[in-house]
């Protein structure tokens, strides 16, 4: 049956109420092509129906027999209904004033940043800035972040964010293992480090043979450790002078990592000035809501000598083709997509959007504003200390920035009860102690409430705050020897945009430089740049989700946990597995967790020797990097001429490693963009040799509702909620990477002993700092699934496959499609082979990518999985009109290449070799090129009405790496 156009439905009378209700309205807005467009594309492909196309694309042996079993979410909800249902869950959360601390603090998000960054699709729909010429705005914002972190830590260079403080500390541990003394495998963690950080470090250390020791900081120098982690200030609030200790650790051949509070560093001596080699921490309190644990941007800063060992993205300054300053991602050869198992880390997605928010918080407040906030926080803490001492309590710590640990003896339970009555959370620091951490939002009235609570428990009257304030010496809580004297945030960007008008215009000027989904499609293969609907995004900023502390009592987080449980069951239904954990806060972390689960399973069976991981040659670089981190040995399996796993080679490798085979990691559909026909056989071969099957969920957008890894032989998968389930990419994060497992692996899912979170009773430990990872963005995926329902989720998958095949069919006469399945069909993406073009014209895949910018498009994925190719993934959200615009651009570029091939255009002086063309170049007095200005800037007529101008010419990558500079540049450089 052919799809019916809605106009024909409207011509029928009478229409019932059921026909007029708009439960499917969201799906019609999420899926780009309407019924008529879909039919036109199907006609182009030679299929009468979408179902017929899907039958031809997906092997019958792996098709789902049943509709997605979504239970109460099987039927779609309208946007209003879904928001109301989620609001009902949010209202079950109780927003208390949380003074728990432990790395998480309430904060004020400046409204100008909330509206113009967090809620602005120009920022949140962008991709990781691998194409620097169309990413200058967010690259500048991330460079500001790096400058901010380097200044505040007193170290030479910072990266552009990591996932959370705990994983940043674990990354620092492995960094120091690579550069540290080879005779030691000990990493020493001071006993006042945040407990969640210690847990993640232990999880990360075990598979790679690092021994973690924990004890008093004073004993660190004698531990013969290659690295030592110190907390500054400590978890109990102490501000300690570690200068002599750092010297002793260095004298013993070790290195020092400091986990430092970013706000405290505005008033405390920075770690880089007293001996730290690496500093890590969380920037959450710079304007990013707690969000039940995330997402937040962690940071890492290092001494210059370690810059090439840093994990994650690093923004650097270079020049463009005209010699003007330009920004780009630097030192990319460190990263997993290039170095695979030899990479510094498996981190791919980081926390770009949150790093941008934190950097803009610093830009908006400036150094004076930040210091004022810090001094106010410290003053409130000092007044609280004075008040409770006046009431007869003793503080465990005499020095502090914002945190007090108080001896409360037998009054402890009563104190917590009085606090709960005032809707206040205090930290439970044992049976006889209470912790209090104040923050930017703490007011005089809040201080009065806190003093009243302690007074009630003491049977006394709370002291007068003004009297306390008048009698308190200036800054008595900070050791004078550790007060900061060095300047920070001296660059003009942190000293100019302090009025809202200036800030608004600065943010607009940056976003205007970038190309995101709000301008055009982003056809990046394996990245799934689909719609991030506004209704999905709205709940992220609700205080009932944003102002919840991750360690709040369970009775205050009922709504959160119900929503999370529901989302886990939705994902169980989509994957065909038995259980899901949402703790991993990136795809790389979910992948890593999955491999640890496999190892734990083998260990439980007395087969801990199984450590070989088979990985196809076509796999994404994250796979071997994760396997290496999980302590596995990577053995590469060849692919055949069609891009499929070579079954003969797989059998040979499985036979050779039968005794020690742990797992195979496969991506499905494959990274070559096809549904391999023999995926069941692959799984059976590995299972026959005692291994487990890890199915990478990067391409889940081609499977939802049609097939499921848990049903065709997979044992474990990670998903990318920032791909398939609509969490935006944010310019390089946030993301969520749930790990889904079969029933035999469920008990090994991540847990967190310090908070009592036990998803699996024999869990692998914590892989993220918070029990539920990046919990505050989970409502996005919940909303998407609730509004789509089972039928429309399947329709979205089918449309993604339709769109990809339409592009492949239309472009095949111009660019060979490198891999396809039976009937010449692809899955949800296709690979265009540009290698013959380079041979015939000298034009490279890079030239084509840059030329697409002149046409107003982000390039497809370049040279992955095959060098010299473009991988195109349109997703289901793009309309036929937008697909046709992209197709027209690619055909026009092919005509420009043909002109070079035929000698009608010079091999060096042509629009592709000089792309992209900036407005300054096109309007300059001199035009030295053989082609016209019009061809350079307006190669197709549609650009006249809507032209995006790249702000810089082609970035010089080699120059940037040779002359590495990763801080803000002087204004004069832009003159």
From Swiss-Prot:
Keywords, sorted A to Z: Oxidoreductase, Pyridoxal phosphate
Source organism superkingdom: Bacteria
Molecular function GO terms recorded: glycine binding; glycine dehydrogenase (decarboxylating) activity; pyridoxal phosphate binding
Cofactor (UniProt): pyridoxal 5'-phosphate
InterPro entries associated with the record: GcvP, GDC-P_C, GDC-P_N, GDC_P, PyrdxlP-dep_Trfase, PyrdxlP-dep_Trfase_major, PyrdxlP-dep_Trfase_small
GO terms under biological process: glycine decarboxylation via glycine cleavage system
Gene3D superfamilies: Aspartate Aminotransferase, domain 1, Type I PLP-dependent aspartate aminotransferase-like (Major domain)
UniProt GO cellular component terms: cytosol; glycine cleavage complex
CDD domains: GDC-P
Residues recorded with modification N6-(pyridoxal phosphate)lysine: 723
Pfam families, sorted: GcvP2_C, GDC-P
Subunit structure: The glycine cleavage system is composed of four proteins: P, T, L and H.
Similarity comment text for this entry: Belongs to the GcvP family.
Protein name: Glycine dehydrogenase (decarboxylating)
Organism from which the protein derives: Burkholderia mallei (strain ATCC 23344)
Originating gene: gcvP
